[in-house]
């Protein structure tokens, strides 16, 4: 069964990768690449779509790329990969990788690609995945409690809920769903599974609703819990962290990063990474150096874009979408590498990793 998918922020995302004078809200407006450089990238550049989905963004990008350009598309979803393979069969510029964008650096290296000219990520769950009850992402449709992006590997949400402790469930729901009734929800799940296992989405939604004491206007009481479980079972934030680090390492000078996020956890991570890489190192700030001798930022922020009223009217999912864009400068990475610019991740149940080489401003 085919499900309609409308790509969110389609034109702004592709513009962000290709237009020399692209600038979103809050963008730096000086020192960006010239039009000739941008045109050369469009004609012969290498681009990555880390979240192919049903290919809306990829098709628009291909329409605007030259015949010598190359596009590498990633997705964990077997259904998305089937669509991508059909596209690649008719367009020699397309290379398909069945896997997540977290492995971008390794997968590109295996194909002889050492640098790229642009990467776009459309985070979260897609409309076809939500609309397909059999995938288990929606609390509005009866389906198996799955939620895996890649249905060929890994435990389902039902598998994890059957064995997780109350503390583990509480921590995941609180951290990844920002649910203030996380403890009550975890206890309700534990009580329910003691009598019979949770097998379907509606069973879980009903269980969660019984534990959430107050209702947020316009939001189902299971929204935050479903988000948390999906993020956890697919390791979404951990994979985003790896992808942001890879982008910093792979992007050529003038190359662009364009990331669409749909909730505050993702957007905060992207925003913090761009902000950290857009600040010059300050270790030598008090030394008598000329400005040209000081380290420069790794990224130049090109701002953010949100959907306008017209797009939201035609696609309600666009309401919460935020596109953030950054441009790679000529400054080389330091000895600490890209990880120093990515926010430290704390996976529920594990200690927070130290952030190596984090640069601090002097007090």
UniProtKB/Swiss-Prot annotation:
It comes from the Bacteria. The keyword Transport does not apply. GO terms for cellular component: cytoplasm. Its EC number is 2.1.1.199. InterPro entries: RsmH (IPR002903), SAM-dep_MeTrfase_MraW_recog (IPR023397), SAM-dependent_MTases_sf (IPR029063). Belongs to the methyltransferase superfamily. RsmH family. Specifically methylates the N4 position of cytidine in position 1402 (C1402) of 16S rRNA. This is Ribosomal RNA small subunit methyltransferase H.
């Amino acid at each position: 069964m085919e499900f309609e998918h409308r790509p969110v922020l389609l034109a702004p995302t592709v513009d962000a990768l290709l237009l020399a004078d692209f600038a979103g809200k809050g963008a730096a407006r000086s020192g960006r690449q010239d039009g000739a450089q941008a045109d050369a990238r469009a004609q012969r550049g290498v681009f990555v779509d880390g979240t192919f989905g049903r290919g809306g963004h990829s098709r628009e990008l291909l329409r605007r790329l030259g015949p010598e350009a190359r596009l590498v598309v990633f997705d964990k979803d077997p259904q998305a990969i089937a669509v991508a393979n059909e596209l690649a069969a008719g367009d020699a510029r397309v290379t398909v990788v069945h896997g997540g964008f977290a492995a971008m650096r390794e997968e590109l290296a295996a194909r002889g690609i050492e640098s790229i000219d642009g990467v776009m990520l459309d985070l979260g769950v897609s409309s076809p995945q939500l609309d397909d009850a059999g995938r288990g992402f929606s609390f509005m449709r009866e389906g198996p409690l799955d939620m895996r992006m890649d249905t060929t590997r890994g435990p389902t949400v039902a598998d994890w809920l059957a064995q997780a402790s109350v503390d583990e469930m509480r921590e995941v729901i609180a951290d990844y769903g920002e649910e203030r009734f996380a403890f009550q929800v975890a206890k309700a799940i534990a009580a329910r599974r003691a009598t019979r296992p949770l097998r379907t989405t509606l069973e879980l939604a009903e269980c969660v609703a019984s534990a959430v004491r107050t209702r947020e206007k316009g939001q189902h009481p299971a929204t935050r819990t479903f988000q948390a479980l999906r993020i956890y079972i697919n390791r979404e934030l951990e994979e985003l962290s790896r992808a942001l680090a890879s982008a910093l390492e792979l992007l050529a000078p003038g190359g662009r990063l364009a990331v669409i996020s749909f909730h505050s956890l993702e957007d905060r991570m992207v925003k913090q990474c761009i902000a950290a890489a857009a600040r010059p190192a300050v270790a030598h700030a008090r030394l008598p150096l000329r400005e040209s001798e000081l380290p420069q930022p790794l990224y130049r922020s090109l701002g953010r874009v949100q959907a306008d009223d017209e797009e939201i009217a035609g696609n309600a999912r666009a309401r919460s979408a935020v596109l953030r864009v950054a441009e790679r400068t000529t400054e080389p990475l330091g000895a600490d590498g890209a990880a120093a610019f990515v926010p430290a991740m704390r996976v529920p149940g594990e200690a927070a990793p130290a952030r190596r080489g984090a640069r601090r401003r002097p007090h």
